[in-house]
Regions:
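Conserved helicase motor core of P-loop NTPases
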Residues: 134-317, 323-326
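Short glycine-/polar-rich loops that comprise or flank the Walker A/P-loop
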Residues: 31-32, 98, 123-126, 184-188, ...
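Residue-level recognition of short, solvent-exposed, well-ordered loop/turn junctions
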Residues: 122, 310-313, 329, 379
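C-terminal accessory regions
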Residues: 332-449
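ASCE P-loop NTPase helicase motor core
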Residues: 1-221
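Structural beta-sheet core signal
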Residues: 36, 129, 277-279, 389, ...
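Residue-level signature of catalytic and energy-coupling elements of molecular machines
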Residues: 74, 104, 132, 191, ...
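Short, charged/polar "capping" segments at the starts of alpha-helices
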Residues: 44-45, 285-287, 423-427
Length: 449
């Protein structure tokens, strides 16, 4: 089945309750084998954290909660990727030993990886996909989640399903489907109530205006003067530098205090993740490369560090190339810390599953880049209290409503959009279109090969 919804609608809570129900109602002599997975290590860690928190308040017997796993895998690790990531141990001839597979952030999965995953799941097993179809699709081929959702109506069900639902719950709250049945009929639900950001709040209304492509309403809300949503047009380099040193500098200073006082790793990562600078592009005045350089200059000056030093306490790094030997993957974030326990002055701390941390020499890392600013693509699967979203100086085909939506929904409490209004309007009016043929095959009930 597929559970869709924007961040904060309760997708993970819903799947935890589904797992508890399936475990408790199972007639199998042995416990159900359940696997949790996500496309990236960062998303897998967030899934673990969410499941762990939900289990603490789940109204189920302890023996049921104990059978809901907390360890989550990247899809590549779950499938048993080889050293270069081109083939997998688990496939049709050697399927996954799982009765249920739960995959979060499904919008990030490209078509080839989804094909490998489906091939490795036994036909008798259940697959539960969680995701937000309004977010950016994978950089690689396909828009799998959107294509899967395309053939069927959301939140409308067959008469047979409505009858079973009424018998089980006594409720007539669901609506009947008016479309022809497909293989996805009764297998999709869209969660619409947001428990984190109220629909009537300024951020909730702003999100809706972007999803629907209502550029006029998007602009109206940006100009409303609400504290949690602001707009800023920085006309030149001088204005940008000043903004980095003042407004963004407040958050950098707060993070730097934790670095200087050697806060424990949890506090340090929490401070770092309290804000993020997101960019549509890597290049240009408002791209990640330039903004990272400005923020690094600010931090080095504050810390008295020579501008030429590549590593220094507090530097944030993002892995950009998978290293299966080190178990580091594209998108993993590490923070450089002073290290008096080794011969080298610095080590890079990475957050891992179940609250664990791992330190590595910065000189052993695969390809990486500074990560105070990151692209919207790289931010998928993460959320921050405060987000600064930078648009480029000129219109670009990569700008579309999916990118804007993904960027703004990373913000939990406060959002600042930096850029020209006409650039934003064009982006919101532009919808990304991809064609893979998957929608038609699902609608017609054809096998997907």
């Amino acid at each position: 089945c597929l559970i869709s919804g924007s961040p904060g609608t309760g997708k993970t809570t819903a799947v935890a309750r589904i797992l508890a129900f399936l475990i408790e109602s199972s007639s199998e002599a042995t416990p159900l084998r359940i696997a949790l997975a996500a496309p990236t290590a960062k998303a897998a860690i967030r899934l673990e954290e969410a499941i762990s928190q939900i289990k603490q308040v789940l109204c189920s017997p302890d023996w049921v909660k104990n059978l809901i796993p907390e360890e989550s895998w990247t899809i590549h690790r779950l499938l048993g990727s080889n050293a270069d990531g081109t083939s997998y141990r688990h496939r049709e001839s050697n399927p996954l030993p799982c009765d249920i597979v739960v995959v979060d952030e499904a919008s990030m999965i490209d078509l080839p990886l989804m094909a490998h995953l489906l091939e490795a799941i036994p036909r008798s097993s259940r697959l539960i996909l969680l995701g937000d179809p309004h977010q950016l699709s994978s950089i690689e081929a396909g828009a799998v989640l959107e294509d899967i959702m395309g053939p069927g109506e959301k939140n409308r069900y067959s008469l047979a399903f409505l009858k079973r639902f009424r018998e089980y719950t006594g409720s007539d709250s669901l609506s009947p489907s008016e479309a022809d049945e497909s293989v996805m009929t009764d297998a999709m639900v869209e969660l619409t109530r947001n428990y984190r950001i109220r629909d009537e709040s300024i951020l909730g209304r702003f999100k809706k205006s972007v999803v629907t492509g209502d550029a006029a309403e998007t602009l109206h809300l940006l100009e409303s003067g609400e504290e949690s949503l602001s707009w800023l047009d920085l006309p030149d380099l001088h204005a940008l530098k000043n903004y980095v040193r003042t407004e963004i500098g407040k958050y950098l200073n707060g993070y730097l205090k934790h670095v200087v006082k050697h806060s424990d790793n949890n506090e340090l990562f929490a401070s770092f993740d309290s804000f993020r600078v997101l960019c549509a592009l890597r290049g240009g005045l408002f791209g990640t490369i330039h903004l990272n350089r400005l923020m690094e200059d600010f931090l080095k000056e504050k810390s008295g560090i020579h501008p030429s030093r590549p590593f220094y306490p507090g530097k944030a790094l993002m892995v950009t190339n998978n290293d299966y030997a080190l178990q580091l993957f594209n998108g993993d974030i590490g923070l450089v810390l002073a290290d008096d326990r080794s011969k080298e002055p610095h080590s890079v701390c990475f957050r891992e599953a179940k609250g664990a941390f791992r330190r590595l020499s910065p000189y052993t890392l695969p390809e990486h880049e500074t990560a105070f600013a990151m692209t919207v693509h790289k931010s998928q699967g993460s959320e921050y209290e405060r987000v600064f979203l930078f648009l480029p100086e000129a219109d670009n085909p990569i700008l579309n409503r999916e990118l804007i939506y993904t960027g703004i929904t990373r913000a939990r409490r406060e959002l600042t959009v930096c850029g020209r209004k006409d650039i934003l309007i064009r982006a919101v009016s532009r919808k990304m279109e991809r064609y893979s043929g998957l929608t038609e095959k699902i609608r017609q009930g054809q096998p997907v090969e």
